[in-house]
Amino acid sequence: MTGTMDSASEYVNKWLIKANNDLKVAENEIKLPQEDMVTEAICFHSQQAVEKFLKAYLITKNVEFGKTHNLEFLLELCSKQDKDFGKIDVGNLSFYSVEVRYPNEFHIPSGDEAKSCIGIARRVKEVVLKKLEIGKSELNI
């Protein structure tokens, strides 16, 4: 993805930038003192990062995924393209896409849960960028 990018690669690049920005929000929040940390925000933004990284990969493979926040489904679609995605465990990260944002499913994740969510997001980022043969400097991320 060097040189002049066509509209398809620009679109993928935008997904990757959005994904990375979500990860940055989570990483910045987790650096705060425990009493100031908003762990549900960390988990939510980690989930969003994973979702967007996986969708960016699927777009490059012309795989339709519809409107979904289900990481297991997206990961399954990715695994059909490349078996290495089958080695990724997203745990219960899909829970944080919607449920954690509303009081009817009230749950405050622990600091350890938040760290785990960021770890998953970092792993997915690493795999997606490797598969797309994109260096961090190419995206300024």
What are these language model-derived features?
Residues 1-141:
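Terminal alpha-helical segments
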